[in-house]
Amino acid sequence: MQDQQIINPISQSQIPQELSENVILSSVSDLYDWARLSSLWPLMYGTACCFIEIAAMIGSRFDFDRFGLVPRSSPRQADLIITAGTVTMKMAPALVRLYEQMPDPKYVIAMGACTITGGMFSSDSTTAVRGVDKLIPVDVYLPGCPPRPEAVMDAIVKLRKKIANEDVRERGNLMQTHRYYSTTHQMKVVPPIHTGVYLEAAARKSPAAALGAGVGEDMTPALVAEAEKEEA
């Protein structure tokens, strides 16, 4: 009677070479992360001069389509927003609304010094937000004034690595417990500047008396003079 060969279960499994080259073992979470990092859809959103570098990336010289980036004009179709340029107090509510309309999971790249700290406007400006992370959570900070397209591509590569290492089941908890908010801005609703009644304003019909006295002649507005001619 032949002795049966005993295979040690602790030893390395005997997988044929053909099978090992055609089968990939992974998890659903890793597959989901790979799909997301390979098809980031950025929102076309720019507030200042940094957006010029984003426009340069769309051209054939840098060709950011090879990263799977598909520019979208609607926040409901995007999962990445690159805040390129200065964010003002008046633009802050619109930015927060755009971020809230993006489906989860969503990512933010703060591009440029003005976006990260306020930049040249951080010392004496009364309208610039000192850091977009006071409004929305930021995943990647990209300093520069403005950053070169190569730097933007490096930030996208780092974001792809971050997505590859995260677990989709933990991202919701991470975004809730590790927020970057440091200051609550009082974003008050203000009336619009252009009301459509500029020509009917009192300053247009009757200028200040001091202005006429300083010039030394009658300062009747042209519109009022034309109306008097038509009535005559």
From Swiss-Prot:
- Coarsely, its chief localization is membrane
Per the UniProt entry, the Enzyme Commission number(s) are 7.1.1.-
Q: Spell out the reaction equation it catalyses.
A: a plastoquinone + NADH + (n+1) H(+)(in) = a plastoquinol + NAD(+) + n H(+)(out); a plastoquinone + NADPH + (n+1) H(+)(in) = a plastoquinol + NADP(+) + n H(+)(out)
Q: Which Pfam families match?
A: Oxidored_q6 (PF01058)
Q: Give residues annotated as binding [4Fe-4S] cluster.
A: 49-50, 114, 145
Q: How does it sit in the membrane?
A: Peripheral membrane protein
Cofactors named for this entry: [4Fe-4S] cluster
Keywords, comma-separated and alphabetical:
4Fe-4S, Iron, Iron-sulfur, Membrane, Metal-binding, NAD, NADP, Plastoquinone, Quinone, Thylakoid, Translocase, Transport
Q: Which SUPFAM superfamilies match?
A: HydA/Nqo6-like
Keyword NAD among record annotations: yes
Q: Which GO terms describe its cellular component?
A: plasma membrane-derived thylakoid membrane; respiratory chain complex I
Instruction: Give an example GO biological process.
Output: aerobic respiration
Q: Which NCBIfam families match?
A: nuoB_fam (TIGR01957), PRK06411.1 (NF005012)
Function of the protein: NDH-1 shuttles electrons from an unknown electron donor, via FMN and iron-sulfur (Fe-S) centers, to quinones in the respiratory and/or the photosynthetic chain. The immediate electron acceptor for the enzyme in this species is believed to be plastoquinone. Couples the redox reaction to proton translocation, and thus conserves the redox energy in a proton gradient. Cyanobacterial NDH-1 also plays a role in inorganic carbon-concentration.
Task: Write down what this protein is called.
Answer: NAD(P)H-quinone oxidoreductase subunit K 1
- Taxon lineage: Bacteria, Bacillati, Cyanobacteriota, Cyanophyceae, Acaryochloridales
Tell me the gene name: ndhK1
